[in-house]
């Protein structure tokens, strides 16, 4: 019985470390400028551009859709384009959620870049300053 318990404990411990992701140290990030905010009925379209470490010049378009009448949370759907420093263009769909607290909005989403990389991404968006502070955590590296 003791051996069975120790085996089970070891399996749980090992499995936890095998499949967990480290969200304490971002792989990279940067600051993007808000270029446009276009309000709609229950949604807003937003575009951003700027520099992200590891990716170079980044261009992003989001549609933020509200899920409640107070318009303080919802879903986001978008596209990203990046021109790497070597001139290669990479693309990604963006899917996630957002939460607004006054003039500050938090974005949480994943990307699936066409080079095989997968990232979990967090943005701190300041609507008044028209800036977004970006952090990304690599879940899987590129295929190359």
Task: Label every PLM stretch briefly.
Residues 7-16:
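Bacterial N-terminal signal peptides
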Residues 1-4:
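Positively charged n-region of N-terminal signal peptides that target proteins for export
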Residues 19-144:
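Beta-strand-enriched cores of mature, soluble protein domains
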Residues 6-7, 139:
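Short amphipathic alpha-helical "recognition" segments used for binding
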